[in-house]
Amino acid sequence: MWQKIKNIFRRNKRLQTDVKIDEQERISIIERACKQVSRGVFYSTVIIITSFLPVFLLTGQEGKLFHPLAFTKTFILVIDALLVITLAPVLISFFMKGKFKPENSNPINRFLERVYEPIIRACLKYRKTTIGVNIIALLVSIPLLMSLGKEFMPPLDEQSILFMPVTLPDVSNTEIKRILQVQDKIIKSVPEVDQVLGKAGRASTATDNSPLSMIETIIMLKPKSEWREGITKKMIVEELDEKLQIPGVVNGWTQPIINRINMLATGIRTDVGIKVYGQQLDSIYKLSERIKSRLENIEGVHDLYVEPVTGGKYIDIVIKREELSRYGLTIDDVNMTVEAALGGAPFTNTVEGRRRFSIQVRFAEDFRNSLDRLKRIPLNSPDAGTIPLSAVADIKFTDGPPMITSENGILRGAVMFNIRDRDMGTTVQEAIDKINAELNLPKGYFIEWSGQYENLIRGEKVLLMIIPVVLIIIFLSLYFAFKSVREAFLSLVTIPFALIGGAYMVYFYGVNLSIAVAVGFIALFGIAVETGVVMVIYLNDAMQQLVKLKGNSRETISKEDIKE
């Protein structure tokens, strides 16, 4: 707006040489310029806000991440538009007085004009060549974009590593403690590691369902200035993974924050998970193993692991009712004794300051894990005195599911894996194609892709659905701004050409396409259209001034005048 008003003042002074403009005429010029610019400002604001409509419609993690950006930008644009048409004219009336210096008096302007003028003259002289070069650059950028990988969000370096190995479901407390200590010692031997904190199993809360076989070790790294020369975080993970190859343990590598987000959002603790739904746990496990075998040779798939639905150990105690009646016992007598021996029974309370703790008593772990000792659990019979549990019950260890997982009332298993050294979109698409081609699912069984890939697909669907609608709204806004389909199309057609620079930058910088990159391109849409609106407004103004000077005729206006 400031530049627009300055140009109007300069034209008046050129037309009225040595004639002083009075205050009323100066205010009139400011008012006329503001009216001329306000329309472009309004529609530019509408267009930029409209271009961010896809961001407002994002859901899930991507919505929570980018909604603040979209709202902040929108509020700033609305306030800026209000200030441009209200406060700016008032300030201009106070401060834009006196003689105006020519634009070339500024050294920066002189430099820019010196660079820009020969370029624009060459482009106007060779118009077809200029258009052809841009079309070729646009056509080349399309396969470049198509060749880029896809991911949900660019990985963020948390300056820490989360090591999540999984052992066999029937691992004992003693063995898991030994494995945990060995792993911590090996991890601490790497020079870049500052601190190591590992845990096995779950906390004593109802919200933590981690089995004893799942280890979580947080590895805090030293500042990068203290790392060995030339080493990267990826190399540290590879070194640790090579050193931590323990039989019966499947390693898993991720980062603490993103892991918690994945687990809370999808229930999958890796980058990608294949949820297998069905009716029988044994069939689900067999199907999961078949899926795993198809994924083993796919590039980029790491830490491949099948969530166990079998392998848990259970104690089955089958009571013999005839023997119970012979000894004068009831089923409740046996159940209460077994419950106290294995599960524990309240014994007493202890008070420490203002806190009170209950104490339970049960058999030691070695006793509970021994079948012979379990058979000798004493029962008090009113007819025969003390008898062993084996006298009235058959006791045996049986295999079963360590954990039964279901979603929407359907039993579920899972095949989980992380993706490294390759983009998520290409890796998962190859896995989907291979599974669809080589695996026939039984009736009543189906699979569902989850994890970060689930977020990627959801974000893509929203963007692909709403972007065409946004382009239509932008075109209508341009039409109402210019009252011309040709000028509206002229402003809109600059969008794909504006993406050329972004496409080349993303490609040569080695960045995968993601929701974050898509939001960046959306912002570029609005800026490109806004620039087109401003240029069309100035071109129309310049043409109107030319018509006033030379008339609206081919005989009076030459091609050189139009170029000038």
Task: Describe the residue ranges of each PLM region.
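Hydrophobic, glycine/alanine-rich multi-pass transmembrane helices and their short helix-loop junctions
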Residues: F42-F94, Q452-L456, I472-A481, A498-F525
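Transmembrane helices with small-residue packing motifs
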Residues: V55-L65, I135-V171, E226-R228, I257, ...
